Amino acid sequence: MRPELIALVVAACQLGAAGTSPGLAQSAQWPAAPLTQVTGQPTPDPKDEPTTARGVHWDFSNHPRLVLSDETFIDFRLKLQWDYRTFSPLPDDPADDTEWSLRRVGVEGQVTRYVEFEASFEIDDPDEPWRAVYVNARPFAALQVQGGHFKVPFSRERLTGPTNLDFTQRAVGVRLIAPGYDTGLMVHGRVWNRRVRYAAGVFGGAADEIDSETDVPSLPGVRPLQTYDDQLWAWRVTLRPLDWKAVPAWLRRVEVGANAAYSHVDEGRYGWRGRAVFGQEFFPAVYVNGKRTRYGADAELEAGPVALRWEYLRGLDERLGQGVADDDLPELDVGSWFVAGAVVVTGERKADVERPRRPLLRGGFGAIEAVARVEHLTIGSRETLGEPASYSPRSVNLAGNRDTIWTVGVNWYPDRLFKVQVDAIRERFEDRARTLLGGQDTFWSYVVRVQFVL
């Protein structure tokens, strides 16, 4: 391990111990996050936050915070993730054995209780280094306006930050279908005693850009989504239907959500490509033209040390005039779902697992969490029209493919700053001709991730 990383770890452990000292236990907490970071947790109102100090000062109870007044402060953030991976069998195009999967710095905070902001920078992404750069005006809890560069309000898992995921890898369907960061304007809020949250926005369309991590396939007449002539519209609503006194307490936290997004892909561009867990292609690009529609639903239950999650997503790309005779073809259809569960075996509530009751080096071992997930992704033509399946990108019935993935893992939280994740991933493809290695349909991957968040 590099000397500078060792020094960082030692300093972080000292900071973690100091951060939980009784003298700092009453410091102010981070305010309500905007809906773009939905995690299923109730959002506290900044006016309810306790504040004991006055004047300009530093607060290190959670992370470095410069407090300018009771309601104005700046948080300085650092997020690091380092991965080690092994594969069996080894794919034709394997991912790197080791990688910094996340190196992000940023600031976030609020100016009075009515304005909050964030700016984060990805160190390892020279093409698009800026992640969230936005300002959120919140005159009322029921009506807030957010503008800048942030996540499109779509998909519970996509809106969950990378350091808060239960698994080392996002579900493949979420990565493929759900839009990510884009520049736009969004109206959002929470109503009905916070049982309902909503968001609706219009965006520039950069979230429809083809994945920049993989080279563009050289298909004749096909170009990537490099210009964004049409806007992307999206909305999301979440509801806690059982949040009533007559309902058992463990059921009140059930939350369901629904979302949709609408955009347009012009002729000469190509649609979604099926990608495996580590980005290898198992369904190539095809010709598309027309409307791009996304929709989905999800549900979550957190009760004590247990959490259960389900999400379904679907995406459709029209193929107008893309046949060999310039005729319209059936839509390109991508569908995915996953079911996931987590249980904290050391007894902490799931909502509090990142702050173990007995941290390492302070009389305990930290918190241990067991997790499991099954996910399913299919991609092909929406209709066959009685035609045989074909690998041609202009065929009526595109030869589809399916990826089924099982993941089991263990998460260790030694203290509030560190997390260690170990995942075993089994991936199976339906079409043996289009997998990660010719003739093989089943692959295993093993990942160890060390995470540090300040």
Q: How would you describe each model-predicted region?
A:
Residues 213, 219-225, 323-328:
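Active-site rim elements
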Residues 14, 237, 410:
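A residue-level signal for conserved active-site and pocket-lining positions in enzyme catalytic cores
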Residues 175, 224-225, 398, 438:
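Alpha-helix capping and helix-loop boundary segments enriched in small/acidic/polar residues
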Residues 61-216, 225-266, 333-384:
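Outer membrane beta-barrel
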Residues 1-47:
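Cleavable N-terminal export/targeting peptides
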Residues 6, 16, 47-50, 61, ...:
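Intrinsically disordered, low-complexity regions of eukaryotic proteins
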